[in-house]
Swiss-Prot record:
Compartments where found: Cytoplasm
UniProt name for this protein: SsrA-binding protein
Organism: Streptococcus uberis (strain ATCC BAA-854 / 0140J)
CDD domains xrefs: SmpB
A biological-process GO annotation: trans-translation
Highest taxon in the source lineage: Bacteria
A GO CC term attached to the entry: cytosol
GO MF assignments: RNA binding
UniProt record similarity statement: Belongs to the SmpB family.
PANTHER family membership: SSRA-BINDING PROTEIN, TMRNA-BINDING COMPONENT OF TRANS-TRANSLATION TAGGING COMPLEX
One Pfam family of this chain: SmpB
Chief location bin: cytoplasm
Keyword Protein biosynthesis on entry: no
Keyword annotations from UniProtKB, A to Z: Cytoplasm, RNA-binding
């Protein structure tokens, strides 16, 4: 099974539109009991999320996990900072890549793997507006070519 192909719970669809994804890496997430119940119910939003390396540790920021409905007093803050579980070598590699290069770590997917919540992070560089327009133009051209080929083959 390829990375990010487990029981998919959430996906950041705008990531490939807004960023050039250079590299991906899988990490575990430290969650409380009510948070994992909300994640299993797919009540998580990755849209504005990002990850940072601070003091040799990886942290997930701005990812919204909705409060568990039956959690009452045990619910944590939906926007709290969550620790990511990575090996020291992976953290050092990411820290070197992020240092002064205009790169960022963004969450791409959240899924379950062997009962544990995993997140697929992308090492990404932001796209300019003209890059986005080129991507859209290329996609439309491919769609037009497929449409013409389909009409030719249908005859």
């Amino acid at each position: 099974m390829a990375k990010g192909e487990g029981n998919l719970l959430a996906q950041n669809k705008k990531a490939s539109h807004d960023y050039h994804i250079v590299e991906t890496i899988e990490a575990g997430i430290v969650l409380t009991g009510t948070e994992i119940k909300s994640v299993r119910a797919a009540r998580i939003q990755l849209k504005d999320g990002f990850a940072q390396i601070k003091n040799g540790e990886a942290w997930l920021m701005n990812v919204h996990i909705a409060p568990f409905e039956q959690g009452n007093i045990w619910n944590a803050d939906p926007e709290r900072t969550r620790k990511l579980l990575l090996k020291k070598r992976e953290i050092n590699h990411l820290a070197n890549e992020l240092k002064g290069t205009g790169m960022t770590l963004i969450p791409l997917k959240v899924y379950l793997k062997d009962g544990f919540a995993k997140i697929l992070l992308g090492l990404a560089k932001g796209k300019h507006d003209y890059d986005k327009r080129e991507s859209i133009k290329r996609r439309e051209q491919d769609r037009d070519i497929k449409r013409v080929m389909k009409s030719i083959n249908a005859r």
